Design a protein with these regions (language model features):
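Conserved glycine-rich FAD pyrophosphate-binding loop
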Residues: 1-97
Length: 97
């Protein structure tokens, strides 16, 4: 965890052991969704200095807003016009916005 003048950054680890191990992946993604949704609804940020990545990218609009997301998309297009640098990691597909 980190403390800044503007606030704090907390890290969490979630653990579960479902009776049916085949649902573990779904439970993992459900935990991410619940944690990120609750954080966004409380006004918290979801990416901090670690970036967004595939698990956080669909929640990035909570941090940046629609205008910020559009600006980030334009910057990404300017520096990576062919979309070859980590495709799908930073931004959700354009039709998902």
């Amino acid at each position: 965890s980190h403390v800044y003048r503007s606030g704090i950054n907390l890290y969490f680890t979630f653990a579960c052991m479902p009776a049916d191990a085949s649902v573990m992946g779904d439970r993992y993604l459900e935990s991410w969704d619940r944690a990120l949704t609750a954080t966004a609804e409380a006004g918290g940020g979801i990416a901090h200095h670690h970036g967004s990545g595939r698990l956080r990218r669909d929640y990035l609009h909570h941090d940046l807003g629609e205008n910020g997301l559009a600006l980030l998309r334009r910057v990404k297009q300017a520096i990576d016009p062919q979309g070859i640098l980590n495709p799908g990691n930073l931004l959700p597909p354009a039709d998902a916005d």
